[in-house]
């Protein structure tokens, strides 16, 4: 099963991705993990990403797309994956469709975790990270609404919304039900 997870920052996508990956028997693919792995292994893509990150810039989509393409073509992803943190934009979604099309494959589902903004702010402030101030969190929410929410229309027909409020296991049960599991 090939699944993309969407939702605002702090919606619990990373937590749910790990659980879904275990229950579906497919790898959890996170762009953050891909960046770290490529950088620590000093791959050509890792070195390219590092240059941007060192300058405080976002890693360009073409670099991210190539990392994702390499990862979804690894043997452990032959039967599917849970993608977390990608795609973030419609351009990245188009790139993913091409990558999967080249593999004679396509997405099975897009889960969108729905969490009210005030709940997101509370959750992220409770994590106690230095860079998680309320202003920063609300700005990340704005960026999500502007750049990532348009994916909901792009993936019309594949999107299943999941109530992301509640205990981790409750949300996971809802996510599995949404996938028909």
Curated annotation (Swiss-Prot):
Subcellular location: Cytoplasm
InterPro entries in UniProt: Adenylat/UMP-CMP_kin, Adenylat_kinase_CS, P-loop_NTPase
Annotated spans, LID: 126-132
Cystine connections: none
Associated pathway: Purine metabolism; AMP biosynthesis via salvage pathway; AMP from ADP: step 1/1
Family in the record: Belongs to the adenylate kinase family.
Known function: Catalyzes the reversible transfer of the terminal phosphate group between ATP and AMP. Plays an important role in cellular energy homeostasis and in adenine nucleotide metabolism.
Free-text domain note: Consists of three domains, a large central CORE domain and two small peripheral domains, NMPbind and LID, which undergo movements during catalysis. The LID domain closes over the site of phosphoryl transfer upon ATP binding. Assembling and dissambling the active center during each catalytic cycle provides an effective means to prevent ATP hydrolysis.
HAMAP family: Adenylate_kinase_Adk
Name of the molecule in the record: Adenylate kinase
Originating organism: Nocardia farcinica (strain IFM 10152)
Gene name of the encoded protein: adk
């Amino acid at each position: 099963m090939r699944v993309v997870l969407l939702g605002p920052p702090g919606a619990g996508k990373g937590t749910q991705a790990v659980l879904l990956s275990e229950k579906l028997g497919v790898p959890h693919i996170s762009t953050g993990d891909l960046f770290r792995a490529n950088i620590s292994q000093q791959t050509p893509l890792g070195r390219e990403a590092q240059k941007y990150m060192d300058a405080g810039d976002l890693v360009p989509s073409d670099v991210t797309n190539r990392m994702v393409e390499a990862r979804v073509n690894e043997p452990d992803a032959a039967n599917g994956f849970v993608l977390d943190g990608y795609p973030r934009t419609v351009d990245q979604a188009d790139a993913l469709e091409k990558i999967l099309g080249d593999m004679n494959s396509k997405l099975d589902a897009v889960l969108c975790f729905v969490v009210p903004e005030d709940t997101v702010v509370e959750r992220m402030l409770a994590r106690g990270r230095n860079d998680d101030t309320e202003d920063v969190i609300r700005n990340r929410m704005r960026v999500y609404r502007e750049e990532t929410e348009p994916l909901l229309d792009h993936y019309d027909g594949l999107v299943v919304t999941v109530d992301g409020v509640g205990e981790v296991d409750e949300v996971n049960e809802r996510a599995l039900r949404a996938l028909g599991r």
